[in-house]
Amino acid sequence: NFIKNENANIVCLQEYTERRRENKPPAELVFKSMDLDHFAKSAYFKNKEVARLFIATFSQFPICNKIEVHSDHRLIALITDIVVEKDTFRVFNVHLQSISFNDENYRFLMEAQQNISSLQSDSMQQDSKKIFWKIRTGFIKRAGQARLLREIIETSPYPVVVCGDFNDTPASYAYHTIKRGLTDAFMEKGKGIGNTYFGNLPKIRIDYVLLHPKFQCQRFQIIKQTISDQQNIKA
């Protein structure tokens, strides 16, 4: 309902699940009821029989082209070319590598925050090494993914809009690599710190809308909701 209330022209979802055994209409039918008649979607994992996780873009305007971007066999972006009257622009719906923490990792972090002295134990030191390597691996993978997207952005035949979940902060290499030459909608019209992640880690801004200089941002909003540990953004 909150998407319907926003009356958006284009909606980019980085993760949504369709369960084949549930008696529910597919997402494209739901969005058509919001006048978002055009869509493109791609599954992260092609062989899931019960539930499939998708990245998807829904639009009030015609979509004339769809491109998947993969890095190390992982889907990291869905590109769509959208036609508005006589103009075409390219939307990058992006979902970069996460740090892939599991429940055990989060429990370790909570325990470490509550009792710093516990980090001296052998088991806690082993757990801290696992955390370090996951963070390091995430940074390295996002850096490569960002460079790949940068190359595609620079060769785009149309003005671009880049949006999505970068899983990284505004100080990161990934953010600055992708943002080069683009305008951050939050920096133009946002207010406050702009945090979009409210999970078990420190609150940070990891979701972005970046615009080609041809576009002018009129407003930016973080949409408060409780169905996820990340907030939705609107520009």
What are these model-predicted stretches?
Residues 1-6:
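N-terminal signal-anchor transmembrane helix
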Residues 22, 72, 134-148:
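Soluble or luminal CAZymes and related metallo-dependent hydrolases
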Residues 10-110, 216, 221-225:
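Structured beta-strand-rich core segments of catalytic domains in phosphoester-bond hydrolases
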Residues 93-138:
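Active-site-proximal loop/helix segment associated with metal-binding centers of metalloenzymes
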Residues 7-13, 128-132:
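Acidic/histidine-rich, surface-exposed loop or edge segments in extracytoplasmic proteins
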Residues 49-51, 117-123, 147:
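Short hydrophobic/aromatic-rich motifs at helix boundaries and adjacent loops
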